């Protein structure tokens, strides 16, 4: 089928320039990384500071920016503190061919970013990149980390602190008094570093950070190749279970919410989970929530409470708990597949006819057990990827499978007009990668989530912008989008929509055009939940994560997605129209459908 398009001048043509500083910074590191040699990271510091990133607003100031530092700390492995060189590549073979034997190095992890890191133990770190978005994400993170590390060191040396006679455990209050910054920020940094906090503070005082970076490879074909390797075990699982020719629903969300909703593992262990909570400290928030739920004083959901507690319960039991949970979920019809490539995106295969109707979350509605058993559909759910890896993944799936029936995207976003934990449903998405704007007939509205949204607020008819990196945006940049009513800032939807375009049309996805998605051969839904507020510095990704209460928006959204799939399969609720395409009316593209 043909997708309606309207050619428009792109931002790159000079009609609109969002930020010369951001563009200069990105161009600087991309050209430097083309070199086959090593690049001193410090050469990027001036352009990083000049950019005025909303995530690193104090980069050029002598004042510490602990929010940006904590953000970087959580997205880099511990070994970065002792590193001198960071080597980036697409696969182990490319690294080994260049004399970097990572297969013999120790694997490393970052707390808040799924990347495959390797630590030589002698000052060299290697990291595998899944897409070009990893470069846009990782390089500014490294620069921010180095800038703030050296600013902390400068203040330590000026204050002569800590001295050799000071206790090894450095209190956050003392850090704030001697170095500046808030006690809360130092406490969060201490939480991030754990028991090594005191030793790490001493290391900062002793060592000026001077990282070097080197890029090996980075071709489009290389990213396509690793995406194919990522998909291969999922495709093999579908073939091995006889699911190859079945209708497929693709969901990009997380690795826990859909599984909890369809398996009932947590609800089956209600007694054990309640006992587990009753044994926590009496001041623990979950103890208070349990009491409030029992007494009817909490608006929260009992099912969501059990899902949240189950994660803590199984985690507390270590590998035994993890193995028990995976086995139970497999028995309930969910197969987990872990990635061994640079694309660290776990996947789950969920055939609908393998599900037990009695185990489904009751909030889905009344289930027709016969229709569920007769459904030939299968859900492939993945943990949301980063940036343009989303395009690579969905395109690879669409090439390999002809029976794609629906695509649903659930992800985190920054909000310019709502609060953390709110849900945003957009019908316009501007993609900075391609410079195109998509006009959607979103499968979801607030009505689909409202019954299950207890703590947050639902906002539909929103406009989203897909950015290249959390760091590659500044205040003027955000102001520009806010004036154009683009209030949802995220990183994956644009690439997904580019892939959807190629599913629906004979051409490759366009660049710099407005695209009408009112008629598609598949069902399409996009939902975001607010995880940070860049207009409020204290409430950024570096400062606050989603808590127990923030989980409410995740489950309301996941329930809406699964309920939509089950309705399309005529398993629950009202049966939709006879075909999956959107209503025949084609809306006119408004003149302000994209930034102008």
Language-model segments: which ranges?
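Accessory terminal and edge-of-domain segments that mediate assembly/interaction
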Residues: 1-596
């Amino acid at each position: 089928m043909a997708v309606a398009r309207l050619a428009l001048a792109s931002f790159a043509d000079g009609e609109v320039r969002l930020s010369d500083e951001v563009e200069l910074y990105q161009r600087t590191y991309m050209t430097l990384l083309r070199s086959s040699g090593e690049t001193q990271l410090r050469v990027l510091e001036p352009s990083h500071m000049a950019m005025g990133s909303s995530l690193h607003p104090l980069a050029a100031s002598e004042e510490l920016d602990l929010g940006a530092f904590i953000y970087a700390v959580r997205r880099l492995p511990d070994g970065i503190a002792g590193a001198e060189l960071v080597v980036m590549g697409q696969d182990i073979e490319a690294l080994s061919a260049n004399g970097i034997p990572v297969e013999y190095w120790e694997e490393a992890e970052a707390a808040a970013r799924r990347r495959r890191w390797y630590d030589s133990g002698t000052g060299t770190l290697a990291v595998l990149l899944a897409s070009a978005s990893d470069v846009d994400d990782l390089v500014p993170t490294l620069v921010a980390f180095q800038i703030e590390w050296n600013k902390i060191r400068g203040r330590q040396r000026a204050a002569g602190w800590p001295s050799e006679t000071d206790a090894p455990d450095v209190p956050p209050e003392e850090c704030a008094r001697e170095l500046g910054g808030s006690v809360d920020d130092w406490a969060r940094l201490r939480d991030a570093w754990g028991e090594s906090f005191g030793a790490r503070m001493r290391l900062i005082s002793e060592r000026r950070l001077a990282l070097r970076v080197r890029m090996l490879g980075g071709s489009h074909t290389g990213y396509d190749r690793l995406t194919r390797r990522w998909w291969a075990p999922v495709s093999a699982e579908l073939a091995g279970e006889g699911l190859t020719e079945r209708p497929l629903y693709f969901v990009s969300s997380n690795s826990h919410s859909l599984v909890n909703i369809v398996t009932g593992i947590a609800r089956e262990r209600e007694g054990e989970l309640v006992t587990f909570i009753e044994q926590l400290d009496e001041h623990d928030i979950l103890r208070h929530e349990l009491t409030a739920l029992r007494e009817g004083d909490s608006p929260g959901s009992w099912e969501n409470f059990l899902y949240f507690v189950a994660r803590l319960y199984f985690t507390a039991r270590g590998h035994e708990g993890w193995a028990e949970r995976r086995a139970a979920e497999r028995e309930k019809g969910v197969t987990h597949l872990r990635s061994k490539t640079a694309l660290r995106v776990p996947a789950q295969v969920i055939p609908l006819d393998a599900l037990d109707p009695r185990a489904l979350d009751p909030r889905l509605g009344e289930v027709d057990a016969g229709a569920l058993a007769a459904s030939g559909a299968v859900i492939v759910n993945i943990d949301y990827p980063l940036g343009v890896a989303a395009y690579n993944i969905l395109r690879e799936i669409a090439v390999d499978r002809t029976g794609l029936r629906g695509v649903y995207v659930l992800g985190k976003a920054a909000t310019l007009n709502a609060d953390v934990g709110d849900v945003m449903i957009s019908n316009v998405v501007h993609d900075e990668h391609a410079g195109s704007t998509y006009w959607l007939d979103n499968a979801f509205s607030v009505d689909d989530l409202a019954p299950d949204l207890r703590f947050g607020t639902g906002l539909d008819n929103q406009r989203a912008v897909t950015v290249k990196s959390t760091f590659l945006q500044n205040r003027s940049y955000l102001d520009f989008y806010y004036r154009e009513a683009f209030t949802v800032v995220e990183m994956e939807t644009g690439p997904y929509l580019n892939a959807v375009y190629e599913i629906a049309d004979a051409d490759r996805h366009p660049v710099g055009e407005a695209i009408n998605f009112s008629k598609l051969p598949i069902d399409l839904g996009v939902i975001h939940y607010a995880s940070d507020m860049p207009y409020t510095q204290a409430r950024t990704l570096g400062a606050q994560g989603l808590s127990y209460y923030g989980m409410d928006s995740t489950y309301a959204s996941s329930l809406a997605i699964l309920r939509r799939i089950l309705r399309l399969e005529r398993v629950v609720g009202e049966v939709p129209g006879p075909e999956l395409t959107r209503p025949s009316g084609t809306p006119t593209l408004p003149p302000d459908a994209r930034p102008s």
